[in-house]
Amino acid sequence: MANPRQRNKAKSSRTQKPSLNAKRRMHQKLRKAPPLKGPEVLQEKWDKKKTVFQNYAALGLLPSIPVSKGASTSRSQRVKLPEVPAEAEAQNVKVGFGRIIRDEEGNVIDIIIDEDEEKQEEEQIEVDEEKELEPVEAKTEVVKRLEELAASAAPVKRHSSMSERTWLQQLVDKYGDDTERMARDRKLNVWQKTEGEIKRMIKKAGGVQMLRK
């Protein structure tokens, strides 16, 4: 049971502690979702009263996968994938692998091994290329505008920092373009960068000739 003195102190305005209502308001502010960061088209069409899943479904941003149509859309639900017949599985055997066919009791009845792996690999590459070339029409206006933004986006040019450039100049002055020896230098390569990482850093800085100036 609460002490009457403590109860009166909490109700009094002389106390420095926040009241129960003030605490409740603070917790409500903390529970509020953060502002959406992204393209303006998403910010305009985003409904704050809906969940993320509901917004994605309304904007046409959900992938084409089987989704449960029940009242609840919680993440704990698991979607049962459609069963693939054995004949279809047999056609999709990966190169270098075989497939074991079992009956209902679990006994092995057949083992499928592709004899012509090279031909299957070439056919699979052709199918994949055809799938990549097939354009998918956007279903909503939001998706169309997002695709236009993605098509017009330019790559961000990265620049080396002054300290990174100074360090690379020391390596180039000592080893020239021999990145293998740069990676092995324990004194200069204090960050233990690999040969590939050093190559990418030199390329980002403008190349060996730019670092020699």
Swiss-Prot record:
Any GO BP annotation: rRNA processing
Keywords: Nucleus, Ribonucleoprotein, Ribosome biogenesis, rRNA processing
Biased composition (Basic residues): 1-14, 22-34
Cellular compartment(s): Nucleus, Nucleolus
Region of interest: Disordered: 1-42
GO cellular component, one term: ribonucleoprotein complex
Function: Involved in the biogenesis of the 60S ribosomal subunit.
PANTHER family, alphabetized: HSPC111 PROTEIN-RELATED, NUCLEOLAR PROTEIN 16
Similarity annotation: Belongs to the NOP16 family.
Oligomer and partners: Component of the pre-66S ribosomal particle.
Name of this protein: Nucleolar protein 16
Gene name in the database record: NOP16
